[in-house]
């Protein structure tokens, strides 16, 4: 029987590192279902395609362009089988199975073994991202030791149009005509967390965030921004009049969490009407 890869389990995503974004599904579902049929969507920093997959699942014939910047996802896809091998060896070395002991530290002896095993990964950076969550000071306590469904991973991007563009502010006007632009840029602290040039360099991170700032200014359609609550981008979104959503289950947490800013604008179907063109020339918000 052929599997339906759109009906994935929201609690058990088939790909690593999408769990945090999928926690937004209760907020996103009514927003996605309200999008007009055939709307054009640009997912600017798609990561592991979590938001694009939710759009594909609940949208009505949406035309989704997902930007796999630097082939981030496809690098990880190529290493899923090798990551599963590493997981098997780490479990045999005494690592916890699953996320039940997510915040429990390992003994120094087991920790040393796990680090050595992880270092055998074919692409060590990709393997680290697949296995860890958190930054360098907490990463060793947070192995995600659940083998991945290789078949589901291979079909994860079916039906999506994939791009590979490193975005900067000068490119924002090129994507401004989309009905919806999804912005999920790297956090400001990301380069320091992962090390210069390993996951994403500081210059690329700054360029990505500059693209988001410009996109919020020039976009004709709606914009969804995911970022840290105290960031400059969230402050800009609030000034524009964005609706700010707290992710379910994160309110009052001590650690930094993520918010979603929803900038609601007219559908692009009306963007070229003379009245709206005149309003934009006058600098009026529409």
Predicted feature locations:
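Class I S-adenosyl-L-methionine-dependent methyltransferase catalytic core
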Residues: 2-286
């Amino acid at each position: 029987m052929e599997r339906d890869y759109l009906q994935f389990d929201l609690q058990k995503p088939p790909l690593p590192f999408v769990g945090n974004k999928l926690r937004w599904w209760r907020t996103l579902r009514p927003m996605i279902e309200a999008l007009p049929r055939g709307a054009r969507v640009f997912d600017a920093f798609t990561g592991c395609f979590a938001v694009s997959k939710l759009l594909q699942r609940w949208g009505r014939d949406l035309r989704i362009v997902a930007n796999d910047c630097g082939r981030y996802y496809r690098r990880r896809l190529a290493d899923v089988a090798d990551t599963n091998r590493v997981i098997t060896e780490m479990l045999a070395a005494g690592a916890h199975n699953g996320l039940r002991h997510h915040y429990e530290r390992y003994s120094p002896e087991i920790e040393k073994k796990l680090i050595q095993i992880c270092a055998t990964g074919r692409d060590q950076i990709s393997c680290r991202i697949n296995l860890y969550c958190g930054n360098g000071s907490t990463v060793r306590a947070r192995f995600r030791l659940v083998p991945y469904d290789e078949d589901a991973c291979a079909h994860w991007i079916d039906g999506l149009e994939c791009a590979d563009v490193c975005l900067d502010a000068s490119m924002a006007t090129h994507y401004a005509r989309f009905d919806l632009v999804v912005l999920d840029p790297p956090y400001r602290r990301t380069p320091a967390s992962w090390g210069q040039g390993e996951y994403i360099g500081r210059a690329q991170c700054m360029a990505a965030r500059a693209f988001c700032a410009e996109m919020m200014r020039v976009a004709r359609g709606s914009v969804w921004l995911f970022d840290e609550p105290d960031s400059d981008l969230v402050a800009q979104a609030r000034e524009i009049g964005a609706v700010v959503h707290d992710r379910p289950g994160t309110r009052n947490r001590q650690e930094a969490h993520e918010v979603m800013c929803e900038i609601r604008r007219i559908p692009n179907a009306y963007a070229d009407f003379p009245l709206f063109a005149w309003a934009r020339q006058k600098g009026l918000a529409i």
